[in-house]
Amino acid sequence: MEGQTLDKIIIENLKGVVEAVLIDEPKKFWIELRQNGEMVGRIWWDVTEFDFSIDYIKVVFWFEDKDYKTVAVRADVDEICEEVKKYFK
């Protein structure tokens, strides 16, 4: 995974489950989850702690349904993708 950005990791991880599209606009940045072209949820993340002196960054991921209700919050990109996969089974 080295050299990959979080959005690319999420998009690749969810292939075949749900379409994941990066929304990158001024003041907007998240992964929109779509089925048949319709938005069915989203994943967004925020840096909660960082210390560049020791190269440490903690990121928290939110998975929300189409009504923007939180389904899961995880501190690991693979775990949040697993929550999305379970939700759309």
Where are these regions (language model features)?
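Negatively charged, low-complexity tracts enriched in Asp/Glu with abundant Ser/Thr
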Residues: M1-E38, W62-T70
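Charge-rich, solvent-exposed alpha-helical interaction surfaces
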Residues: I9, N13, V17, D76-E83, ...
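Weak global preference for isoleucine
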Residues: I9-I11, I23, I31, I43, ...
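Alpha-helical interaction segments
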Residues: E19, R34-Q35, D51-S53, V77-D78
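General N-terminal targeting signals
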Residues: I23, T48-F50, Y87
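Generic detector of intrinsically disordered, low-complexity segments in short proteins
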Residues: L33, Y87-F88
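Intrinsically disordered, low-complexity regulatory segments enriched in Ser/Thr/Pro
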Residues: M39-A75
